[in-house]
Amino acid sequence: TYYPRTYEVTYLLGMLAGITSRSDHVGYVAANPVYGVPAAINAFVQGLRSVRPEGRVVLRWACLPDPAHPLDFSDRKDIEVFYARDDREPEGTHRDYGLCRRLPDGILQPIGLPEWRWYTFFIEIVRSVFDGTWNSANGRAINYWWGMRSGAEQINYSAGQNSGTMQLLR
């Protein structure tokens, strides 16, 4: 099996949310409460609190839409920074993704976008088959659980981030 260590990226995005938010409240939209999603939420909260100890995360579930509580947190004036989808949206759709800030005019400004680089897994697995290091022994589980150091995931930060902030996040 293979999967990226999503908690590494969400921890750093939680830190960035704490640094860039003007309030102690930030939002988080999670897909559904399965697999690594609760761990990613926890990592985001821990990242937030590492730079803003009084910080609080308001959680909303994308799988349970509620018109009274929109996923862009437009009903909460105390939340200007929130984390939403972790996929790239089609060019020109202006949908929220990654870590965003809602500007006073309602436009969403991207701050940081996680990128899951699945091809890293595929290249290394195929390479190990070709160089003879891959072992297909029966009854033996092989797991690939790689993080940022492996290149399986990264964060694309928006231009204009403070140099001190970037030094902290790297």
What residue ranges belong to the model's regions?
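Hydrophobic alpha-helical segments within soluble ligand-binding/sensing domains
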Residues: 2-24, 116-134
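Solvent-exposed loop/turn segments at secondary-structure junctions
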Residues: 32-36, 63-66, 87-91
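A post-motif C-terminal structural segment
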Residues: 77-170
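An alpha-beta-alpha
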Residues: 10-55, 141-160
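Stable alpha-helical elements in mature extracytoplasmic
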Residues: 9, 13, 37-40, 44, ...
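Structural motif
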Residues: 62-75
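Glycine/charged-rich beta-loop-alpha catalytic/anionic-binding loops adjacent to active sites
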Residues: 1-2, 28, 102-107
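Short beta-strand elements in bilobed, periplasmic/extracellular small-molecule ligand-binding domains
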Residues: 52-64
